[in-house]
């Protein structure tokens, strides 16, 4: 006999957990949260995300999502460990045009409530990021409240809140294989462990969203795309930050090098480099491995060394100490991209079937809050029209167009200033 509940959330990454958390805050109970992977490192994008949170965004909606996410994560802890490290975020400028553009970002930040943002000198950058060569930059754009999230720990903290309130239950290793739909109304889901019934179902499966959409005969227009991350050998002077757990203890500021589509973050006693400066590599949801078939996790694929050569050279140029270190871990992780870079939120064409996908860690807290308000009250507090799933026209769902725009958005994810 199928289990009945008030709502089923498919996907227990940070977006699904955030929505459940905020629904519980609004008094909802009898929630079921399902995931195909093991709890709570389920194998999706949340499980390997670098955790960097840069709040500044030309979209007011996205900027507000990020600001709320920082506030939320700073309020959370799990087993005595924080879910956010407020180390600050710095975008450095290699060129004069980039440095001029930082002032545009500063204006955006101030108008959207990031009033502590400011432009800083190369020497000030050096104080917060001691491995950078200050002679290579014109300065930096600094937001003190930016920082580093511990994504899996945040999921654990929010899930604990939900279960402690007896507001919902989380079930891992439970793959959704189909949807029950009658007269265009969602009635439940079919899973590898039986059927679940509910008149509200939220899909928050990230890179698997297109596959979930096809199971329900709707389009969730995003593309999974590979993204490179590497870990360096440890730095002796950072040994005090070495930890016996996966989430990082950090002190150095989160760094972004917009002119080469790179970011850098301290990770315990070493550094991680993230690279967007490579050919976009688009996948289909159906190509992704099942959790039980993946060597480490299904959201990771083989690293491509050729794609990293230019990024490696540029990183060593900007951070000379990096040239002394070998690469100890290399991954191509998979994240979601849409045609316009905004998330897929709201009720779909099937009544009661909702989506919250293509959401980064940066915005997950705010998106979860908005989704809960939308489901409970009929509309969220924040204007989220830029993220509404119903914003798309017919051509936006054409696979060729979607892949083309997804590739372009990947190329430009760090390039608010093009052709400099």
Language-model features, listed with the residues they occupy:
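Active-site lid/adjacent beta-loop-alpha segment flanking the redox-cofactor pocket in flavoenzymes
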Residues: 235-351
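Helical element adjacent to the flavin cofactor pocket in flavoenzyme catalytic cores
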Residues: 143-199
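Helix-loop-beta segment of a Rossmann-like dinucleotide-binding subdomain
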Residues: 81-91, 116-118, 122, 126-165, ...
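C-terminal catalytic lobe of FAD-dependent flavoproteins
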Residues: 302-405, 415-416
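Dinucleotide-binding Rossmann-like beta1-alpha1 core, especially the glycine-rich loop
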Residues: 50-128, 259-264, 282, 299
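Conserved small/polar residues in nucleotide/adenosyl-binding loops
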Residues: 418-420
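Glycine-rich FAD pyrophosphate-binding loop
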Residues: 24-45
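Central helical "cap/lid" subdomain
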Residues: 198-245, 382
């Amino acid at each position: 006999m199928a289990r009945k509940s008030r709502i089923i959330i498919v996907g227990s990454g940070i977006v699904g957990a955030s929505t459940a958390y905020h629904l519980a805050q609004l008094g909802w109970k009898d929630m079921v949260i399902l995931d195909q992977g093991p709890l709570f490192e389920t194998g999706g994008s949340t499980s390997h995300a670098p955790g960097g949170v840069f709040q500044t965004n030309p979209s007011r909606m996205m900027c507000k999502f990020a600001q709320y996410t920082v506030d939320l994560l700073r309020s959370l802890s799990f087993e005595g460990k924080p879910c956010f490290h407020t180390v600050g975020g710095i975008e450095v400028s290699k060129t004069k045009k980039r440095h001029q553009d930082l002032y545009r970002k500063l204006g955006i930040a101030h108008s959207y409530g990031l009033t502590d943002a400011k432009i800083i000198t190369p020497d000030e950058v050096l104080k917060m990021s001691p491995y950078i060569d200050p002679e290579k930059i014109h300065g930096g754009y600094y937001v003190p409240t930016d920082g580093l999230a511990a994504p899996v720990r945040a999921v654990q903290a929010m899930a604990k809140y939900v279960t402690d309130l007896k507001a919902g239950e989380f079930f891992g290793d439970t793959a959704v294989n189909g949807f029950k739909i009658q007269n265009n109304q969602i009635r439940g889901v079919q899973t590898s462990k039986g059927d679940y019934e509910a008149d509200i179902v939220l899909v928050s499966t990230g890179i698997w969203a297109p596959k979930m959409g096809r199971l329900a005969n709707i389009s969730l227009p995003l593309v999974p795309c590979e993204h490179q991350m590497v870990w360096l050998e440890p730095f002796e002077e950072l040994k005090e930050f070495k930890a016996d757990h996966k989430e990082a203890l950090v002190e150095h500021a989160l760094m972004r090098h917009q002119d080469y589509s790179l970011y850098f973050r301290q990770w315990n006693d070493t550094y991680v480099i993230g690279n967007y400066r490579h050919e976009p590599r688009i996948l289909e949801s159906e190509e992704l491995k099942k959790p039980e078939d993946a060597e480490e996790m299904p959201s990771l694929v083989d690293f491509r060394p050729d794609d990293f050569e230019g990024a490696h050279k540029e990183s060593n140029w900007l951070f000379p100490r990096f040239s002394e270190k070998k690469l100890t871990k290399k991954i191509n992780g998979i994240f979601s991209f849409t045609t316009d870079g905004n998330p897929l939120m709201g009720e779909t064409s099937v009544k009661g079937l909702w989506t919250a996908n293509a959401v980064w860690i940066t915005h997950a807290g705010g998106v979860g809050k908005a989704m809960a308000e939308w489901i409970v009250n009929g509309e969220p507090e924040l204007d989220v029209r830029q993220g509404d799933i119903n914003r798309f026209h017919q051509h936006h769902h054409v696979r060729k167009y979607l892949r083309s725009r997804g590739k372009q958005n990947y190329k430009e994810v760090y390039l608010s200033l093009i052709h400099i």
